[in-house]
Amino acid sequence: MSLALKQKIITKCAELDIPLVGFAPARRWDEPLFEPWIPEEFRPQSIFPETRTVIVIGLPVSLPILETAPSIYYHELYRTVNTHLDVSGYRISLILNSLQLPSIWIPRDGYGSISILKERPLAFFSHRHAAFLAGLGNFGINNMLLTEKYGPRVRFASIFTAADIPPDPVIQNPLCTSCMLCVNSCPVKALDGRKYPKGLTDKKACAIRSEALSKRYISPCGLCIKVCPVGGDRKLYAREDMRMYTGDSMEYEKYHKAWKHVRSYGGR
């Protein structure tokens, strides 16, 4: 295993303004940590048999922009983050290939449209589980991957490589506080309040909601990740008082006015 290669990738991620990167050996997918586990056909070596290590990169979505969701503002942020992730993942795979280490990039999404997700709510690879196995965080009741720096407000992409790279440890202590803000804020009741994986998102309900917002040019929804109290980004933006989202305090009226203003333009 090459510590030098690992550091080279971490340095490259810093150059690409990617704040989160983690490494997981492909064998971790064959060692179930909970049930139900990842089916064999969704594991890295079933997709790219040469895989020895999965590199996961993560980019945050800015909390103050997310707070306007659903809106054209968050819609554009989501698109921008996704594009940056895909380009960066592809570039990292090219660097590894140039070192004679067979590697491929896995895009952040693996579906053509929301209508497809309504029929079959699965992608061919789960970046959330990859991020979990690469030590970037663990699951919350909202079924999202919670990270220490950004809570669930992160998008992920992955690189499969034939290189043996020293792994990062899986985070054992749960980050989710079981506050239920995500459950209570979901407009389609897609979360049942049980901890993952016993409690699973109603993906069809979520997809129907996303499709409706997409027709108005203001998808995705984002409410369950907006209200999550976990993440160092809350301290950065002085968003640690969760009452600001309930409307119970006049102290935060200026924020609600700002969000309403943004939501009033650019979509239907």
Model-derived segments and spans:
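Catalytic cores of enzyme domains
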Residues: 37, 74-75, 80-260
